[in-house]
Amino acid sequence: MKVFVAGATGALGRPLIKQLVEHGHEVTGMTRSESKRELLRELGARPAVADALDPDGVARAVAEAEPDVIVHQLTAIGEFNPRHFERDFAATNRLRTEGTDHLLAAGRAVGVKRFVAQSFAPWAYERTGGMVKSEDDPLDSSPPGQVRTTLEAIKYLERAVTGADWTEGIALRYGGFYGPGTSIGLSPLGDQIEMIRARKFPLAGKGTGVWSFIHIEDAASATVEAIEHGTRGVYNIVDDKPAPVSEWLPELAKAVGAKPPRRVPLFLARLFGGELVVVMMSELRGSSNTKAKRELGWKPRYPSWRDGFARGLG
């Protein structure tokens, strides 16, 4: 198939293109930077330069590629600072709203049969009831103020994509990325790894918040499966082992040669990081990958973050 990947040079876009090429697909990779043309060629993709917030430029790039499938992996996420979360995610929120609209319009004009978009699982689900959520569970109706606009952008993307009745619209709720090129990776050194080594990523309270992770290569392989035979709807793309912070954070510190994380009370975490840090440390729900494994026939290379942290950080 002809596959058009927007956000092609990001942490997920790069391994995704490699895997698509290995599967025999003809890939066009969209970037807004002229300087990344050669990188896309090296990955095996035909480069297309366009700004995702320019509807005419996106339309031209998609029309020229004539894809069967569009993959929306657009983000613009910098260094994570919970105190300035909305500011830091403002550009990504525009890509999840305006950028989504532009890609959908361009895809409709050429009649793509599938439209696969990046969504997000880690702090999106309602923080009540069971500790592991499926795609049928509701998203958070009262998120911390720091992420309210970002969660609304995620909800907008999912509604727009899965509600497009002219194509097979698929939203992939990825877990927390780790591995090469991510913030939890060693090549290059990710900012969260730097924080852990500097003991600036403490364990707050009892660390009962449950996180779901996914290795970046496994995220790419699940995306390939969705591109090839996914059906309309939402899929959690996470590993098999949701885990509380009290379990995974010390293991990650050990894996990267750091001292055990400091422990701080929740009131200090709230004071320095705001309500979001308290939620992430004590209230998050994990995600189930049962649907993705059943319907996509997908099996992660790293079923557990334990193995991934030990062998897959890069």
Predicted region positions:
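Conserved beta-loop-beta element that borders a ligand/cofactor-binding pocket
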Residues: 114, 119-120, 156-180
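Glycine/proline-rich active-site loop of Rossmann-fold NAD(P)-dependent oxidoreductases
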Residues: 127-129, 155, 167, 178-191, ...
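Amphipathic terminal alpha-helices
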Residues: 303-314
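Mid/C-terminal beta-alpha module of Rossmann-like enzyme folds, strongest
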Residues: 2, 15-18, 220-276
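Conserved Rossmann-fold NAD(P)-dependent oxidoreductase catalytic core, especially the SDR/UDP-sugar
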Residues: 80, 84-146
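A conserved pocket-lining segment of Rossmann-fold NAD(P)-dependent short-chain dehydrogenase/reductase
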Residues: 140-146, 188-214
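N-terminal Rossmann NAD(P)H-binding glycine-rich loop of SDR-like oxidoreductase domains
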Residues: 3-25
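NAD(P)H-binding glycine-rich loop region in Rossmannoid oxidoreductase-like domains
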Residues: 32-98, 102
